Amino acid sequence: AALTTLSMEAQAIGAVNTIHFHNGAIRGYNTDYAGFGRLLENNGIEVQGKSAAVLGTGGVSRAVLQYLIDHGVSKIFLVSRNTQSIAPYMKTLCSSVPTQFVNYVHLERYTGDLLINCTPVGMYPKTDVSPVGLETVEHFETAVDLIYNPAKTLFLQQAEQLGKKAVNGMLMLVAQAVAAEEIWLQREISNDVILKVAAEMEKQL
């Protein structure tokens, strides 16, 4: 069946990962957006007026970019192995904010506030790799890795080694799932539940 309507964030991002049937209507949502927001909020990471480098141009990076734009990011570095292959819709998504499209080698030249890994590089079982080198991590204040297994990727280990703030993606995983439950149940779920579940899941890794 075709979707009847889209939530504002799903429409802006151009991707749906949750649907809700209500009174004959089918509404589409993107809960990665809310999940990423909860991840930042619970870790005290500010977006307003900050510059952010987003590694990767896949589906989750679209939600991350939209959240950053909606919450006042001042500049974006969208990082891809081949900047020529960045899809037009990604460029359109970033059009309201000063954006530079850079490859991984050239990213070493820039400095910024947030460095966000939206790629699977470093995920279990291939945990001995990082999407970027120490030279790049050194130029940013906070490293966010949306990977949650392992809890501390090589990328985050690099950040900690350099004295940077390092945050993994477990809380986002839980928060986006809870956001879907909130849509289906039509009620809010306490943030404490998200924190508790994320902590329990991290212990299992």
Regions found by a protein language model. Give the residues of each.
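Rossmann-like adenosine-cofactor binding region
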Residues: 97-166
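NAD(P)-binding Rossmann-fold cofactor-contacting core
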Residues: 71-93
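Glycine-rich adenosine-cofactor-binding loop
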Residues: 28-30, 49-69, 80
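Short helix-loop-beta connector
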Residues: 22, 45-51, 138-139
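Phosphate/diphosphate ligand-binding glycine-rich loop within oxidoreductases
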Residues: 1-43, 152
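Conserved S-adenosyl-L-methionine
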Residues: 70-75, 161-165
